[in-house]
Amino acid sequence: MTETNFSTKNSNHTPMIKQYLSLKSQYPNMLLFYQMGDFYELFYEDAKRVSRLLKITLTKKGNSNNNIIPMAGVPCHTAEYYLSKLVKMGESIAVCDQIKDVYSEKKLLTRQVVRVITPGTITDEAFLEENKDNFIAAVWKENNKFAYAILDISLGFFGVSEHFDRNSLLSEIERTNPTELLYPENFEDMLLISHKKCIQKRPLLDFDIKISYKLLTLQFKTSNLNGFGIKKNHFVIRPAGCLINYIKLMHISFLPHIRKIQFNYIENNIFMNSSTRKSLEIIESISGESKNTLSSVLNKTVTSMGGRLLNRWLNTPSKDLSLIKNRHGMVKLLRPFYKEIQCILRQVSDLERICSRLALRTALPRDFVRMRSTLNILPDLCLILKKIKSTSINNVLMSIGKFEKILFLLKKSINLTVPSSIRDGGVIACNYNKKLDELRSLKKNSQKYLQDFEVKEKSRLNIDSFKIGYNNIVGYYIQVNKRHSHLIPHSYLKIQTLKNVERYSVPLLKNYEKQVISAKFQAIFLEKTLYMELFDIIEPFLEDLKNSAFALSELDVLVNLSERSISLNYVCPKMTKKYGITLVESRHPVVECFLENPFISNSVDLSKKNRMLIITGPNMGGKSTYMRQVALIIIMACIGSFVPAKYASIGLIDKIFTRIGSADDVSNGYSTFMMEMTEISNILHNATCNSLILIDELGRGTSNKDGLALAWSCSKYLMTKNKSMILLSTHFIELTKLENFFKNIKNFYFSAFEHDSNIAFLYKIKKGISKKSYGIAVASLSGIPDIVIQDAKKKLIELESDNVF
């Protein structure tokens, strides 16, 4: 047998291995956690893979079919920790449990897969990241257009979008960053998705439009999808149906909290491709970290729901002027109250994900406790919001709600502190159910009964060593020292002899044991029943609870932006339909937070008179920072945030493009020059007059003449055809002559000065052209040997006098 062959026909396999292989054949592309007593074991290739990923010992389990069986395992009680690590690595796991009693007379225990865990279908908080959405996605191509569907089971969000080109789809994949991505077996554009960690090929039948339509209407309990803005034959139905079908295959048979599907119109938001997102370091830095990003500065939300929502906003800045102005208005109104509100919001749990687990009936006892705590503080929050006289704030207030009935139920039914699961009881509070109280009382009073029995018999028999004990093997027993065994009456039945003691039982004790154990199991069974009834009682309120969760997350974001505006000295931008961008004494929102010295502010004026600013100056002089801060301020303003400037007026922006070399990725076989040309080509084809374009040193990576010619021609095309708003930095001084040909091109520069072989950067933008590049001075700061620097200075003098070699 090879390690990838799951056939059970070979009679040389042991019964256990046959059972394992049979189960494994049903989940060939997943790791199979196979329970054996107190451990989950993995065999063959699964064992090797898990051993490598988790750095656990790889051992072996004898031979089967004349082959050594590789084996690795983890204890059952720590399995969740290892499962979480594997899921975060992009692995999918089938968990197979023993379902027969351990003491069954059958030699081979019955086992079955009880849950399937994939990166995109998890809802357990142990596997989820607090401030990140957890999307599973599916893609479909038809007539050179793409349909894309996303679903976050942990939140209950389901959306679809339509894309007319590869760049648009790639941008959406990067924005949503799915943890699992499904694609049809005949998908041709694998380069678009092959970089994702967990991609799953699915049969074409999963994307069948008729089957998908039926699945979706059944899911939403509707006769059609017209109410969601989706026509019967629209091709977005295909990937959406594939997601529903796949999730059902993953042992999630019903999704009661998925009640609608949202058609996401990407044209409602500012378009940013993956290159722009990387170079602007909005959510992740170029190195893939979360620190030193726009999100790391702006996202000081106090709830995980708010953290996720703000990151969504940062990834999809709006073009809707009324929406943006409404957010600015609420941020302004909330400024005097942010401390009070944040103090209360810190007590709010992740109600979004709790609601989803309640709908799926996978909520743990702590979810009920956290929901109770959250609902308990809502009245205090509402009292503060009522002080603010605003229609927008009042709408948030109405959505938050009160939920007195649910709160009363949870206070009455759930203990103040609860165990991690309902398995052993201890969750339902006293005085909630009379029968449960009686059963618990019987169990509780058993200790008093046993103590009385022990005192009575000890006195009657005059045996000092007489005592009553309990273990899981023999149950309740009477124990005496061997030296007192002659005093034991004949009615006592000896059940165990140990080194120094003997153990006995009596019918009275056994009968009482049965009553106590029966009461214990009856209590646990009843408690589980009452626990499940809570799901039924809460279910009708779930939609309102989800709306409340969203309102709380939105409030958290807006209050957070209020706090940021005060703490970081931001101003409310003026949003207008007019063309252009005016920023007075603007600052880079990220860089200013990490400088020891005050950030040097700069202004910018992009208008029909100043469409392109050509910026010269030394490396490290501030050119890239200046360009990035303009784009970041636009993004901040368009999500509803105040901005780092003394004054800001921002017109309509439809797209933001960047060509900044620090984001180059040559791992796919592209040279830096090819990357640059590809991105510039994309800009030339897709930018409009309302687009903001940042280009840092166009024309690198080839000869000076080739580079200058390309930079000149591209700049000319952008001015005459695209007519966009452009910030272009360059070391080609010749490029500044474009100002002589176009009245709406202006030259600016960042200056520096040298003194005693040292260079000082002024970081202040001025009108005009930089006289020097200061390249050698900057190079000396990098630690290049002084002898090389001095030689370079001599060569520069020769070059400038045309006496080259």
From Swiss-Prot:
Pfam families: MutS_I (PF01624), MutS_II (PF05188), MutS_III (PF05192), MutS_IV (PF05190), MutS_V (PF00488)
Superkingdom in the source lineage: Bacteria
Keyword Manganese: no
One Gene Ontology term, aspect cellular component: cytosol
InterPro entries in alphabetical order: DNA_mismatch_repair_MutS, DNA_mismatch_repair_MutS-lik_N, DNA_mismatch_repair_MutS/MSH, DNA_mismatch_repair_MutS_C, DNA_mismatch_repair_MutS_clamp, DNA_mismatch_repair_MutS_core, DNA_mismatch_repair_MutS_N, DNA_mismatch_repair_MutS_sf
UniProt: ATP binding residues: 617-624
SMART domains: MUTSac (SM00534), MUTSd (SM00533)
Gene Ontology MF annotations: ATP binding; ATP-dependent DNA damage sensor activity; damaged DNA binding; mismatched DNA binding
Biological process annotations from GO: mismatch repair
Alphabetically ordered keywords of this record: ATP-binding, DNA damage, DNA repair, DNA-binding, Nucleotide-binding
Purpose of the protein: This protein is involved in the repair of mismatches in DNA. It is possible that it carries out the mismatch recognition step. This protein has a weak ATPase activity.
PANTHER family cross-referenced by the UniProt entry: DNA MISMATCH REPAIR PROTEIN MSH1, MITOCHONDRIAL (PTHR11361:SF34), DNA MISMATCH REPAIR PROTEIN MUTS FAMILY MEMBER (PTHR11361)
Family according to the record: Belongs to the DNA mismatch repair MutS family.
NCBIfam families registered for this protein in UniProt: mutS1 (TIGR01070), PRK05399.1 (NF003810)
Name of the molecule in the record: DNA mismatch repair protein MutS
Gene designation: mutS
